[in-house]
A protein has these predicted regions:
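C-terminal structural segment of proteins
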Residues: 1-277
Length: 277
């Protein structure tokens, strides 16, 4: 039962959606609704107006950008679609793996790429995969379209009057992998990691063990050049500031820091094996 009252509009196109967001204080975007609707029911969030963008075809589909250098993943692409898309599987496998690991089939069928990225909390999988891929998000707002690094989006909320329209991922990216340990009941990550091995060194992003999804540049620097033996990876994690890792439900910060280090070593070794093929 939703206890608060609000208005509801289903805009015909993106321009109408943007006008509604700009013209109504307290307007919120409704897409998959996996985070917003439970929060409205519980009273954790409020809205004066729900702008339902679920039928905006322009925000769907996975394509290549005109110059062929990036994949453009529409914000309304569901997690189930992302997990099985041939282009994503071939060129951004950590994104497909993160989508597969997200929740149960019902969550994946309803949840969207845009919603998962905007949520960007401690218990979301897709932001770390996007950060490891060096992806950017495309935002549409009153001033036109802009881009923002996925890492910057995870650090703070998107503008309230903007709509996340797409995720842009470098095409044919370097070897990558995603690993996760999840709560059996909720499928929320206890911790998760995504990695890519680039010519300049590894890119590593983690969630669950930290207060929000983070790139671990200190760990990346310590591991530059590899090889990615488990003990070397764990030593790189132990060198991080103790306060970086935060306790979870029934788990200590020290344990989570160790666990995410083990997962990162596993992911790096898988990506390294792919690089050798």
């Amino acid at each position: 039962m939703i206890l608060t009252e609000f208005d509801y509009v289903r805009p015909a196109d993106l321009d109408e959606a943007l006008a509604l967001l700009a013209g109504t204080r307290g307007a919120r975007i409704l897409a998959g609704g996996q985070s917003l609707l439970p929060d409205l029911r519980s009273g954790a969030d409020r809205a004066a107006l729900l702008v339902d963008i679920r039928r905006l075809a322009e925000l769907r589909a996975v394509t290549r950008t005109p110059d062929g250098t990036r994949l453009r993943i529409g914000a309304l692409t569901t997690l189930a679609e992302l997990a099985t898309d041939p282009l994503v599987l071939a060129e951004a496998p950590e994104l497909a793996a993160a989508a597969r690991a997200n929740g149960d089939p019902q969550v994946r069928n309803l949840g969207t790429v845009g919603g998962n990225l905007v949520a960007a909390g401690r218990a979301t999988d897709l932001p770390v995969a996007a950060m490891a891929a060096d992806a950017v998000v495309e935002l549409a707002g009153p001033g036109g379209r802009t881009t923002l690094a996925a890492e910057e989006l995870a650090a703070g909320p998107a503008p309230a009057d903007a709509v996340l329209t797409a995720l842009l991922v470098p095409a044919a990216g370097p070897p990558a992998a995603f690993e996760k340990t999840a709560d059996r009941a909720t499928r929320y990550p206890v911790c998760a990691t995504a990695v890519r091995i680039t010519p300049g060194g590894p890119r590593i992003a983690v969630t669950g063990a930290t207060s929000r999804p983070l790139r671990l540049r200190g760990v990346e620097d310590r591991l530059r050049g590899g090889p990615y033996r488990t003990e070397a990876v764990l030593a790189a994690f132990r060198a991080e500031p103790r306060e970086l890792f935060v306790p979870g439900r029934g788990t200590s910060a020290e344990y989570l820091g160790h666990l995410v280090g083990v997962l990162t070593a596993r992911a790096l070794q898988r990506a390294e094996q792919a690089l050798a093929r």
